[in-house]
């Protein structure tokens, strides 16, 4: 036989089909053996570059389902021994060209004896009483390699060279078994060994009932992936995984939802999807009673109770509950930023960050609040915003009892009690409680001002400053005093103004007891007690306790007239005189609630 000989094979040449009655009479061991051999045969054919056949059959083989249903459309025969040629309605293997050395040649003997004579049945209308099916494997170098590979997975379930595994099929009867072995061949011996023995992994000590399962498990430790996809080169440790993967390339989605028509390439994906329609949540937490649709979500939730974090970063030792979280974290160490914006070229280490960034260019805010109409880029932002309307504050501080509507706000608050300042500046060593404050501080060293006003070009280091500045151009004053109707463009200005009506002075000097409306006024006042004069004139060295006083003094050196014109035709009045007059008319307390900028 030439090494390059090619033959055409149909699915019937390598498959064995059963009726529902026949399949029901097989015991568990016989079914398992059949399914494993069929799966391995399929994987072998795929590794040789053969086209993918029906994914339904692969799924049923892999999940131990009723195989007579998977193959009943391939044959009209009621039993395997029927001499009538099966009528194939939809062949799954169509003219597969294979090397002859690796073909499984099914030989139906025509006798009840070993000399292949056709046995005569007592009932001529039924099937023959004795039929011997010999499964013989051709001899050749390619066959030897494949046989060795299969034997390593099944502990010698394949036959030796030239040895025929003989299984005698008796007449089908509802009273007896379908198959009876007349001799202990290699297949039977292997099954007996697997029944009696257990197989233990030397790496982790895990025990398996079958050697095939042990071999598959050991690939976790050895990282061996012998099954390679011919389309993309991706490798797999199991042939079934390769078969499932190949459906991605074919684009076939045979599992369709009857409710909405959505299709899937795996039955398990369809099952999970159908729970959306049924509302089924089969995975319930025994700790808190919360139920979940998917097992993976349930496992992650359960770790929140146990505190288990099995995924540990080898670089910094940080642990994570799930693998995606670990992968996202690890990119920090590698510095990789694979997600790049096509508009401006900015790169990100997470896809979600790129998505958020792209909304700056598009301006899309698809998530709108039903209460106030405010729109958001992310659904999570909308959910957090909605708590403002409900007033719910589920996150409570155990130290002081203060409640918050966000977990992050609670964590930030708790640092007040612990004194923790995890964000330290590498330039000056100053530490900060909040990351946002730390980022703003770093910009004082770098001089970065990323927020620029489109109207006047003025740049700011903080986004909030840009928003406050922009109201100057719009003239908008959304903050109105309910007492007098005066409007302001900043909420802080409204707060200061309202203290005129309330007379509230929350900032009190601990030295003399004098109270102030603003903390800035208290700070300036406290310098009187300390005697500190931090503002020094560079010309003469004279020091002052206020910046405004230094500015007024420097006019002496510059020769600038320190007077202001109040009105045309009226006499000049010095700034100090103006202050004295205002003190007489309005009182000193009024000056404490006005800014120095307004005085000059």
Swiss-Prot record:
C2H2-type Zn finger ranges: 199-221, 227-249, 255-277, 283-305, 311-333, 339-361, 367-389, 395-417, 423-445, 451-473, 479-501, 507-529, 535-557
Polar residues bias spans: 110-121
Domain KRAB per the UniProt entry, residue ranges: 9-80
GO molecular function: DNA-binding transcription factor activity, RNA polymerase II-specific; RNA polymerase II cis-regulatory region sequence-specific DNA binding; zinc ion binding
Keyword Cell wall biogenesis/degradation: no
Source organism superkingdom: Eukaryota
Subcellular location: Nucleus
Main location: nucleus
One of the GO biological process terms: regulation of transcription by RNA polymerase II
GO cellular component, as recorded: nucleus
InterPro entries: KRAB, KRAB_dom_sf, Znf_C2H2_sf, Znf_C2H2_type
Keyword terms, alphabetized: DNA-binding, Metal-binding, Nucleus, Repeat, Transcription, Transcription regulation, Zinc, Zinc-finger
Region: Disordered, residue numbers: 110-131
Similarity remark: Belongs to the krueppel C2H2-type zinc-finger protein family.
Stated role: May be involved in transcriptional regulation.
Protein name: Zinc finger protein 543
Organism: Homo sapiens (Human)
């Amino acid at each position: 036989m030439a090494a390059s000989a090619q033959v055409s094979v149909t699915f019937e040449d390598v498959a064995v089909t059963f009726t529902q009655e026949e399949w029901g009479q097989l015991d568990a061991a016989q079914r398992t053996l059949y399914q494993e051999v069929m799966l391995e045969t399929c994987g072998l054919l795929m590794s040789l570059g053969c086209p993918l056949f029906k994914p339904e059959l692969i799924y049923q083989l892999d999940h131990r389902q009723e195989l007579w249903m998977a193959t009943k459309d391939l044959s009209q025969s009621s039993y395997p021994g029927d001499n009538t040629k099966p009528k194939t309605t939809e062949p799954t293997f169509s003219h597969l060209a294979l090397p002859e050395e690796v073909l499984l040649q099914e030989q139906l003997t025509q006798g009840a004896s070993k000399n292949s004579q056709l046995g005569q049945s007592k009932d001529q209308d039924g099937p023959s009483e004795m039929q011997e099916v010999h499964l013989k494997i051709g001899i050749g170098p390619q066959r030897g390699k494949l046989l060795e590979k299969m034997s390593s997975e099944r502990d010698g379930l394949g036959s030796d060279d030239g040895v025929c595994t003989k299984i005698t099929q008796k007449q089908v009867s509802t009273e007896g078994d379908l198959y009876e072995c007349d001799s202990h061949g290699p297949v039977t011996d292997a099954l007996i060994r697997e029944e009696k023995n257990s197989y233990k992994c030397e790496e982790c000590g895990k025990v398996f009932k079958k050697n095939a399962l042990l071999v598959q498990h050991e690939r976790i430790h050895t990282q061996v992936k012998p099954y390679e996809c011919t389309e993309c080169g991706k490798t797999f440790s199991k042939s079934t995984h390769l078969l499932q993967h190949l459906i991605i390339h074919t684009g076939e989605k045979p599992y369709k939802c009857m409710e909405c028509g959505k299709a899937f390439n795996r039955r398990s994906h369809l099952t999970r999807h159908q729970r959306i329609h049924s509302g089924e949540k089969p995975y319930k937490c025994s700790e808190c009673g919360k139920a979940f649709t998917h097992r993976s979500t349930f496992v992650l939730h359960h770790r929140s109770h146990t505190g288990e974090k099995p995924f540990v970063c080898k670089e910094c030792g940080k642990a994570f509950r799930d693998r995606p979280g670990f992968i996202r974290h690890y990119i920090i160490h590698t510095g990789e930023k694979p997600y790049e914006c096509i508009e401006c070229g900015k790169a990100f280490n997470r896809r979600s960050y790129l998505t958020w960034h792209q909304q700056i260019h598009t301006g899309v805010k698809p998530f709108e609040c039903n209460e106030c109409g405010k729109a958001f880029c992310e659904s999570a932002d909308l959910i957090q915003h909605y708590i403002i309307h409900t007033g719910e504050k589920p996150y409570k501080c155990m130290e002081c009892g203060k409640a918050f509507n966000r977990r992050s706000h609670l964590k930030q608050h708790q640092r007040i009690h612990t004194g923790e300042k995890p964000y330290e500046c590498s330039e000056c060593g100053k530490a900060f409680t909040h990351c946002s404050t730390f980022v703003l501080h770093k910009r004082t060293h770098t001089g970065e001002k990323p927020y620029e006003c489109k109207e006047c070009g003025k740049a700011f280091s903080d986004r909030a400053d840009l928003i406050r500045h922009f109201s100057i151009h719009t003239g908008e004053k959304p903050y109105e005093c309910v007492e007098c109707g005066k409007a302001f463009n900043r909420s802080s200005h409204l707060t200061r103004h309202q203290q005129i009506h309330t007379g509230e002075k929350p900032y009190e000097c601990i030295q003399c007891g004098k109270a102030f409306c603003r903390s800035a006024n208290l700070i300036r006042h406290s310098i009187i007690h300390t005697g500190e004069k931090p503002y020094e004139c560079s010309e003469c060295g004279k020091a002052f306790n206020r910046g405004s006083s230094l500015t007024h003094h420097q006019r002496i050196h510059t020769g600038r007239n320190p007077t202001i014109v109040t009105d045309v035709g009226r006499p000049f009045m010095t700034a100090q005189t103006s202050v004295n007059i205002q003190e007489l008319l309005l009182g000193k307390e009024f000056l404490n609630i006005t800014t120095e900028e307004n005085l000059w």
